[in-house]
Swiss-Prot record:
<comment type="function">
    <text>It is not clear if the 2 type A proteins in this organism are functionally redundant.</text>
</comment>
<comment type="subunit">
    <text>The gas vesicle shell is 2 nm thick and consists of a single layer of this protein. It forms helical ribs nearly perpendicular to the long axis of the vesicle.</text>
</comment>
<comment type="function">
    <text>Gas vesicles are hollow, gas filled proteinaceous nanostructures found in some microorganisms. During planktonic growth they allow positioning of the organism at a favorable depth for light or nutrient acquisition. GvpA forms the protein shell.</text>
</comment>
<protein>
    <recommendedName>
        <fullName>Gas vesicle protein A1</fullName>
    </recommendedName>
</protein>
<keyword id="KW-0304">Gas vesicle</keyword>
<dbReference type="Pfam" id="PF00741">
    <property type="entry name" value="Gas_vesicle"/>
</dbReference>
<dbReference type="GO" id="GO:0012506">
    <property type="term" value="C:vesicle membrane"/>
</dbReference>
<dbReference type="InterPro" id="IPR050530">
    <property type="entry name" value="GvpA"/>
</dbReference>
<dbReference type="InterPro" id="IPR000638">
    <property type="entry name" value="Gas-vesicle_GvpA-like"/>
</dbReference>
<dbReference type="InterPro" id="IPR018493">
    <property type="entry name" value="GvpA-like_CS"/>
</dbReference>
<dbReference type="GO" id="GO:0005198">
    <property type="term" value="F:structural molecule activity"/>
</dbReference>
<dbReference type="GO" id="GO:0033172">
    <property type="term" value="C:gas vesicle shell"/>
</dbReference>
<dbReference type="InterPro" id="IPR047870">
    <property type="entry name" value="Gas_vesicle_GvpA"/>
</dbReference>
<comment type="similarity">
    <text>Belongs to the gas vesicle GvpA family.</text>
</comment>
Length: 86
């Protein structure tokens, strides 16, 4: 039985391609306080992904719905459109 060593190493291009394909989220929260008094708070969320990956995620969680149209004034827009003809 022989043992084979794997010498496959990922190139930088392969690593970047995988990150853009799968996406990565870095969520950081830091708070600095002195004697119970909050001096500084930092909240950061960094998302690294391709546009295609983000759009697939946004569609899955419902971030792409147009709430402005649903909450708008549909009666007012219909009144304006009634006087116009093309």
């Amino acid at each position: 039985m022989s043992i084979q060593k794997s010498t496959d190493s990922s190139s930088l291009a392969e690593v970047i391609d995988r990150i853009l394909d799968k996406g990565i989220v870095i969520d950081a929260f830091a708070r600095v306080s002195l004697v119970g008094i909050e001096i500084l708070t930092i909240e950061a969320r960094v998302v690294i992904a391709s546009v295609d990956t983000w759009l697939r995620y946004a569609e899955a969680v419902g971030l792409l719905t147009d709430k402005v149209e649903e909450e708008g004034l549909p009666g007012r827009t219909e009144e304006r459109g009634a006087g116009l003809s093309f």
